[in-house]
């Protein structure tokens, strides 16, 4: 390769050919590079790679386990999705005349080995490019690569990350520290959202990129990279496929994954086209709090997290649909009629993703600290329950061993809280659970049980197919009230189930034990079921009945006079405004540890541009039935996740007791919805979306 100029492109969460600034630059400018070597590195601290070790040898890296709970950093379902993303972009690069290597190791180790191998063959690297990322571990990787390049006299450049909705260079923030601490404040500075994104960049034409090198150094020992996808996936999943708990849930008969999609750039675009053509984007605002099926939300969050599609590409296709300029979208409901509530809601949530990332830029390693963003003020005093003896308060009650059992049951989905258990089983078996369910699961762990929120964030990191560092950790802080939520709040999971699992289908689908239980209040909290029915279904000795982790008082109660009908309400609630939820129990100290929980050193070298699916985000919403869907409205919640902060006084929650006694359960739920329609809350006249908590889409 004498006389040639080799550019090494290190990919991370930019696994796409379309709207890729680096590829676009190489395809359209006079850059002088003769060869391009794209490399995707599997980082052993973030994903377990011991399956690739040659037989008889040992991995030089420790297990890829989380710091607090010792969960896998990447579980089998996300590992499979990630493998599909890697292999798909590899094929796409090949289709435009390039290619992509897959390597294992720390970024600087891989680069050093590549330089050494090339030098031994009298070859060299001219420049290394990569796209910037703001998280601590990613910053460390950037710093390490920049250091190697500086020592070896190799050029290095960090490219601006352009996979987000509004480009950082256009959001008006001169410095990340200027990011408002409240999302609404930031949102107001960016509207109207439809006018803000930059246009996406086209896919490079075949043959427009520098040549792929003909000679490539092998993978450094002791690892090997197979040439076919099936073997690659098998080796990646082998170390992490065993269940992390005893007696894990089995896949229920008749249940289906809400996220059956393969990973990759190609499936991402297929999904986007389907959403627009089917009209699902138009109805998104009405359906986004759904629990079952593939169509209630976009399911684009996993693709966005891996960078297989960009937010501005999604926006650009929505504009074509709204303007009526793309004929292939003409059968989609709302075609050519401008922005609608659904497409506006999608943009709103894409902006949330931008904001969560900006918060990472601003707060850095506070994203992972137990006192969260609010700890920056120095006034955070909350103590959390922990299962770690070394971190627990001397008088912690329950004990660390008891907390460990509570966490195991939370993971297994045997807490006794139907909505929570259904979500946890769905997550463990499919790698996905809905936005609304994530909020309730997080609130239950942090507010009802008072357990260290980082354990929840780490478990979601392991389990979620659509895991995104900024959204996941930021959302868990939000639910734990140590993030950028201006108010402390908590959910009543029984009421939430009545609101969003109105016929009990979701809970019954994933929790086999309650499949044949008739009354919804017993489905949603099995310990309230009468003894005779428990005996009938063989549930008398079930741990969810005999020892629920946290019983939540919620029942049908009789009013004091004849002026009001019977209604669903939390026992003890007098209809006054909530003051915000509080997590119970004493607990551990900060336990900051090391690794990504500590501040990184700044990058030394290179051109750095200065520029947070559940995760468990979403909104406190109460629905109003409309023709063709369940119209969701955005509200600020009080301590029970209710609109308006006024307890249960709103007539939209009331039930006629006589009709309850006379009607079957499914008719009762229809009547419940009808009451909401007849008595809409006055604040439903306000604009939508504006008070949501962090979402995934």
UniProtKB/Swiss-Prot annotation:
SUPFAM superfamilies, per the entry: Cryptochrome/photolyase FAD-binding domain, Cryptochrome/photolyase, N-terminal domain
Biased composition annotated in UniProt, kind: Basic and acidic residues: 188-198
Alphabetic keyword roster: Chromophore, FAD, Flavoprotein
Note on cofactor: Binds 1 FAD per subunit.
Cofactor (UniProt): FAD; (6R)-5,10-methylene-5,6,7,8-tetrahydrofolate
Domain Photolyase/cryptochrome alpha/beta: 5-164
GO molecular function: damaged DNA binding; deoxyribodipyrimidine photo-lyase activity; FAD binding
Annotated region described as Disordered, given as residue ranges: 170-215, 554-697
Skewed-composition ranges (Low complexity): 659-675, 683-697
Keyword Acetylation: no
Cross-referenced InterPro entries: Cry_DASH, Crypto/Photolyase_FAD-like_sf, Crypto/Photolyase_N_sf, Cryptochr/Photolyase_FAD-bd, Cryptochrome/DNA_photolyase_1, DNA_photolyase_N, Rossmann-like_a/b/a_fold
One matching Pfam family: FAD_binding_7
Coiled coil: none
Ranges of compositional bias, category Gly residues: 578-590
Bias-annotated ranges (Basic residues): 560-569
PROSITE patterns given in the database record: PHR_CRY_ALPHA_BETA
GO terms (BP aspect): photoreactive repair
Family: Belongs to the DNA photolyase class-1 family.
Function: May have a photoreceptor function.
Protein name per its UniProtKB record: Putative cryptochrome DASH
Provenance organism: Gibberella zeae (strain ATCC MYA-4620 / CBS 123657 / FGSC 9075 / NRRL 31084 / PH-1) (Wheat head blight fungus)
